[in-house]
């Protein structure tokens, strides 16, 4: 069984035991987050308005890989380099 969940305007197709990285959530490590799924998918049928919740356990908070932003104006001797690391949360799907 799989479930389609939405977190911070992003959708994820998950099943029990999956580990995934989601945008930073304000929850402590070890806490459980309950989400209502958008859809549940079995082998034979798909339920668009399912009952029940998906439980996610917060494993850790970390930063994503660095993204380099480089600006340059030709012939003006102007160039600027900036880096950014997005905060992420790693979660594990406990149950559906």
From Swiss-Prot:
Classification via InterPro entries: bL21-like, bL21-like_sf, Ribosomal_bL21, Ribosomal_bL21_CS
SUPFAM superfamilies documented for this protein: L21p-like
One of the Pfam families matching this protein, by short name: Ribosomal_L21p
The UniProt record lists the keyword Ribonucleoprotein: yes
Origin: domain of life: Bacteria
Gene Ontology biological process terms from the UniProt entry: translation
GO cellular component: cytoplasm; ribonucleoprotein complex; ribosome
Keyword Hydrolase assigned: no
Keyword line: Ribonucleoprotein, Ribosomal protein, RNA-binding, rRNA-binding
GO MF: rRNA binding; structural constituent of ribosome
Protein family according to the UniProt entry: Belongs to the bacterial ribosomal protein bL21 family.
Summary of subunit composition and partner proteins: Part of the 50S ribosomal subunit. Contacts protein L20.
Functional description taken from the UniProt entry: This protein binds to 23S rRNA in the presence of protein L20.
Xref: NCBIfam families: L21
Descriptive protein name: Large ribosomal subunit protein bL21
Organism: Chlorobium phaeobacteroides (strain BS1)
Gene (name only): rplU
């Amino acid at each position: 069984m799989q479930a389609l969940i939405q977190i911070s305007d992003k959708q994820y197709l998950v099943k029990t035991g999956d580990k995934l990285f989601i945008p930073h959530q304000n929850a402590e490590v070890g806490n459980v987050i309950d989400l209502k799924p958008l859809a549940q998918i079995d082998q034979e049928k798909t339920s668009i308005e399912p009952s029940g919740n998906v439980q996610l356990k917060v494993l850790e908070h970390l930063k994503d890989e660095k993204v380099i932003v480089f600006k340059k104006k030709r012939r003006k001797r102007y160039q600027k380099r900036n880096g950014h690391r997005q905060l992420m949360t790693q979660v594990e799907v406990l149950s559906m």
